[in-house]
A protein has these predicted regions:
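Extracellular ligand-binding/catalytic regions of CAZymes and related secreted enzymes
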Residues: 2-5, 21, 31, 200-284
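Hydrophobic/aromatic beta-strand patches that form the interior of the parallel beta-sheet core
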Residues: 8, 99, 179-181, 238-240
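Helical hinge/lid and interdomain linker segments adjacent to catalytic or ligand-binding clefts
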Residues: 6-9, 18-100, 104-108
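Short strand->helix junction
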Residues: 14-15, 247
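A glycine-rich, often tryptophan-bearing local segment used as a flexible ligand/cofactor-contacting loop or short
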Residues: 66-158
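Catalytic beta-strand/loop cores that center a nucleophilic Ser/Cys/Thr
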Residues: 120, 127, 132-233
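Conserved beta-strand segments of alpha/beta enzyme cores
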Residues: 33-37, 179, 236
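Residue-level signal for short, function-critical loop segments
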Residues: 13, 104, 243
Length: 284
């Protein structure tokens, strides 16, 4: 662990218990001797630019840009504005470490390349990915055990299997793009998951679930992953799917995981590994 790291935390586009979340960030950074700053979308997007490469050791994304959400209305996928995707790809091509947290996997649904960059996507509405038409994703709250899949990975240092009460996703993951580090033991039966498009569009659930989805543990959902790593450009990226609310933010194991993830994506080892295995992120 290296002291004096600089962390940028990005939120916006989705509700979050901000005081609890930022309180957890403050304590994580204080314990590790780091400094941090908070930016909100859409103005935060200006930081996600190669012109600012090197300003931050790690960027934590807990936001959903590219999506218009309002209960009682259909969620609308918005393409990146002029130069936005190019700036993001340029930042990733500079070796910027990134951590994607929870609902941030729903970002930029109109840009397939972003799903490739982070290893998956939560679809608020039916969408197309890798040449397939996919249904909207699902969610449910539940108590489950987070399980360590790679005990040797630095993100899992000091982590043992732990119980948590958080939001689970029934959503695509690109299994050929990710290296699993965490799994979970929750029941992933599609009928347990509320259809997100139904809930958002109607303002509440009308009973539509993910039953009947072609669950395959990958593109069609149903996977048990809770965390993974990947490379985008020459940047190390870590994704943690937990992170819905105050009980998770207060969980000691979650705090260790998040701190470890920020530490790892900003490490020389992770950056060298990513540079040795680059991935060209497709532009829109």
């Amino acid at each position: 662990m290296t002291a004096n790291k600089r962390i940028l935390v990005v939120t916006g586009g989705h509700r979050v218990a901000l005081d609890d979340f930022l309180g957890a960030i403050a304590e994580i950074c204080h314990d590790r001797g780091w400094v941090w700053a908070h930016a909100t979308q859409p103005t935060a997007q200006a930081w996600l630019n190669p012109a600012h490469a090197g300003c931050w050791d790690a960027i934590l994304l807990h936001d959903i840009p590219g999506l218009s959400l309002a209960r009682g209305s259909e969620p609308i996928a918005l393409p990146p504005g002029p130069g936005v995707a190019e700036a993001l790809v340029g930042l990733l091509d500079s070796g910027q470490g990134v951590v994607v947290l929870h609902h941030a996997i729903a970002a930029w649904p109109a840009w397939e390349g972003w799903a490739e960059a982070i290893g998956g996507r939560f679809n608020y509405r039916p969408a197309r990915l890798r040449g397939e038409d996919l249904p909207s994703s699902g969610y449910r709250m539940g108590a489950f055990t987070v399980e360590v899949a790679d005990s040797l990975h630095p993100i899992c240092a000091g982590i043992k299997d732990f119980a948590i009460d958080d939001e689970l996703y029934f959503a695509p993951v690109l299994t050929d793009r990710v290296t699993p580090i965490l799994t979970h033991d929750a029941d992933m039966s599609g009928e347990l998951f509320q259809d997100t498009f139904d809930v958002v569009t109607n303002g509440l659930s009308t009973g539509v679930t993910c039953a009947g989805h072609k669950a395959d543990g990958g593109l069609h959902g149903g996977h048990r992953l809770m965390g993974w790593t990947t490379t985008a450009g020459i940047s190390p990226v870590a994704t943690l799917l937990m992170g819905d609310g105050p009980s998770t933010f207060a969980n000691p194991m979650f705090r260790i995981l998040l701190g470890n993830a920020l530490d790892w994506v900003s490490s020389t080892h992770a950056k060298n590994k990513a540079a040795a295995q680059p991935f060209a992120v497709p532009l829109p």
